[in-house]
Amino acid sequence: MEKRTDYCGNITEKYIGQDVNLYGWVQRVRNLGNLVFIDLRDREGLVQIVVNKDSGKDLMEIANSLGNEYVIQVRGKVVKRSEANPDMKTGQVEVDATEIIILNEAKNPPFEIKDGVEISEQTRLKYRYLDLRRPEVQKAIILRSKILRATHEFFDENGFIDIETPILGKSSPEGARDYLVPSRIYPGSFYALPQSPQLFKQLLMGAGFDKYYQLARCFRDEDLRGDRQPEFTQIDMEMSFADEQTIQDYTEGLLKKIMKDVMGIDLKTPIKRMSWTDSMNKYGCDKPDTRYGMLIHDLSSIFKDSDFKVFSGAIADGGFVKGIAVKNGAKEYSRKKIDKKADFIKRFHAKGLAWVKFEDGEFSGPVARFLTDENKEALKKEFDLEGGELVVFVADKWKVVCDSLDHLRREFAKETGIIPKGVYDFVWVVDWPLFEYDEGLGRWVAAHHPFTMPDDEGVKLLTTDPHKAHARSYDIVMNGDEMGGGSIRIHKRSIQEDMFKALGFTKKRAYEQFGYLMDAFDMGFPPHAGLAIGLDRFAMMLAGKDNIRDVLAFPKNASASEPMMHAPAPVADQQLADLGIEVEKQYEDSVKATEERLEKMAAEDAEENSTWDK
């Protein structure tokens, strides 16, 4: 095929007077009788093609035959428009066509190929190859590609080695559920797809590759949310002979390059740091949104002797009274609206939501009658009340208070419009606890993972009081979302064994699962550290999207299925037999129904669209 002169969206005034050869999709055709306008689209944008009566009968007939999404080749001369379109990059010019070649026709698509149209997720994913033609979708995918390019350039410039680690590995019951791959050669045995390359990259440090990175594909069989997919990509790095500061410096360098190359923003470094304890106490969570204020205040000292027993009773039971002040919230929030907030935080086990309003120098609301003059003055000073504020309180155990006020703070910020737009605010959260209590499992688990090095005091506490130990770990947070996390890793057998003991491992279990790692520690293993950034979530936020699916070319839906190829799907009985797998009877009807549904859909598609027998 003849070489394209340039992309449609790049045909600007510099091409005036030149003959060009373009390829693209027909976005729209406007027939004015003796004049036909064609909007030709490719990934860079639109350019207007003009065909008139002077172009000849054959060319006019071809132009009139075009439909939306036809794929065409256009030859012509670039001329200045008589009336410019300031809303288009190519709005100063148009192409006076001399030849149009139809490369492929198109049926009417199930939705318009343009931005701003309402399309169900199911339809978008079923016809993803059409959805991907839309400019806003392409823009997000291209942004992701720019992040990848900047990442490779940064690590290459800084002496890191790109090393691929295995996709087929061994299952570990820690963390989320694994995706399992049955082995035909070893019936009854399974590979697991990696949840992360954690142990492989640590072993690479033991092998002497002191600066590793990888754009690592990871897989987790977990419940999906807007910011999760069953398969995802990590920007993964590991270094030998590195401490926290070294890893953070390199991470900041990477983020600085990405923000500049992709967004045109000069990221100021060093990025501020905040302890995990401060983050929890001031923001209610370990991923603080630092773009706005509305911080959480501990009011326990003010209310420890209060006549309001909800407050004083919670404090006497070892709990806390904390609150936030919502500027201009007094008029914005009715009792009905506040009651809805109270109902919502019950999911965090909060028993209720107390509140007062401060207007014209006076407090009002359900709690106001319990406030002494001393309480009132203390609240005014604590929150720097000026008038018009709504102050909400939660009195309960520390974790309940944190979870509840974290949610309320985020909701109030969205609803009152105080979150600045176009701001990317990063913060390091450091000095984490080594363990956290999992209410669902009813036991202590590693706050990050079992290979995290405790701090010096924590090493001693591992064998005496491990749940008081702190970790040498760090998370990078942007706009209230965890972008990534890392830590100094354990590199000695004795510490790793103590860590497993603290997590309730038996010796047998520890060595069956991780004996190879502890053996490696005895072979001259260097101190090492690393970090991983969630690429998909990072791209989603930079693209201004609410769902990770918008920055993936072919994502799964909220049910972890893919409507276009119909994955997952049943497989042939012989394939199962080769693997020594038999579907349990309770699932046979479901499998049969799925097979019949897919066969019917394929038959209908063939009947309606196929040219097989024509």
Curated annotation (Swiss-Prot):
Primary localization class, coarse: cytoplasm
Cellular component aspect of the GO annotation: cytoplasm
Mitochondrion in keyword set: no
Entry binding sites for ATP: 220-222, 229, 482, 534-537
Keyword field: Aminoacyl-tRNA synthetase, ATP-binding, Cytoplasm, Ligase, Nucleotide-binding, Protein biosynthesis
Compartment annotation: Cytoplasm
Keyword Aminoacyl-tRNA synthetase in record: yes
Listed Gene3D superfamilies: Bira Bifunctional Protein, Domain 2 (3.30.930.10), GAD-like domain (3.30.1360.30), Nucleic acid-binding proteins (2.40.50.140)
UniProt-annotated binding residues for L-aspartate: 174, 220, 448, 489
Chain segments carrying region Aspartate: 198-201
One MF term in the entry's GO annotations: nucleic acid binding
UniProt EC number: 6.1.1.12
Catalysed reactions, as listed in the record: tRNA(Asp) + L-aspartate + ATP = L-aspartyl-tRNA(Asp) + AMP + diphosphate
Class of the enzyme per the UniProt entry, highest EC level: ligase
UniProt record, GO biological process: aspartyl-tRNA aminoacylation
Its biological purpose: Catalyzes the attachment of L-aspartate to tRNA(Asp) in a two-step reaction: L-aspartate is first activated by ATP to form Asp-AMP and then transferred to the acceptor end of tRNA(Asp).
Subunit structure: Homodimer.
Recorded family membership: Belongs to the class-II aminoacyl-tRNA synthetase family. Type 1 subfamily.
UniProt name for this protein: Aspartate--tRNA ligase
Organism taxonomic ancestry: Bacteria, Bacillati, Bacillota, Bacilli, Lactobacillales
